[in-house]
Amino acid sequence: MSARQEQKAEAFRALHEGAPFVIPNPWDAGSARMLEALGFQALATTSSGFAFTLGKLDGKVTLDEVAAHVAALDAATELPVSVDLEHGYDASADRAAAAIRRVAAAGAVGGSIEDWDPVEQRIYDFDHAVERVAAAATVAGELGFPFTFTARAENHIRGRDDLDDTIARLQAFERAGADVLYAPGLKTVDQIRAVCDAVSKPVNVLTVPSLTLAEMAEAGAQRVSVGGALTWVAVKAAADAASAIRAGDFSALDARVPAGDWLREDEGRG
């Protein structure tokens, strides 16, 4: 751990104690620099967006690849970086928890573990899910700096719209030591409020396009992330332009961005 990483960790932890905030999800170092220049205070990786940059589907990236990605983002920006660790790249509680240590060594100051088993294509049993969170929380607490550990309950993005089970899992994850709780796929203000009212730790909400930050914050959300959405906005723009080019129309290429401002070379960066 460096003084720089400790400062990032403390800044990230403090964000969870202040006003609700948006944490956008860059897909590479350039997009991280852009988001920093636009004034965001912290960044989170996107598993699906990063996988796309490697020509892979979500869930097919290795821990080695994620650690290298984290190191690149950390070197590119002075913002805190939190990592989507999916299921921890192993069903075992201890080995999944070890992913926390691995990305912390690469520069991360936060990270999440979810309760979805990509091998069996199912939600982990309740007790095993809690065991995995407890193991990850233990590792996070041993790092020597305030690593912000997020525990995810995946029901609502995996076709299992059981709010009672989601709340029970998040409450158990809180008791197991998670710093932040997250149930991606909540769709309404009432669902967000029910989750936030049921726990005492900060809650991350995956953005709902039909809701504003103010509405989600009023329901209790402390942190709002966008997942892979920014990646897909960029990819769609590129695909639409490429389709026009293929048809002989080059007007879509008339785009200007302040890349020089976004990618300025600051002394001491990284």
Task: Annotate the PLM regions.
Residues 2-3, 12, 228-270:
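Extended, intrinsically disordered, low-complexity segments
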Residues 2-83, 88-226, 232-240:
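Alpha/beta enzyme core
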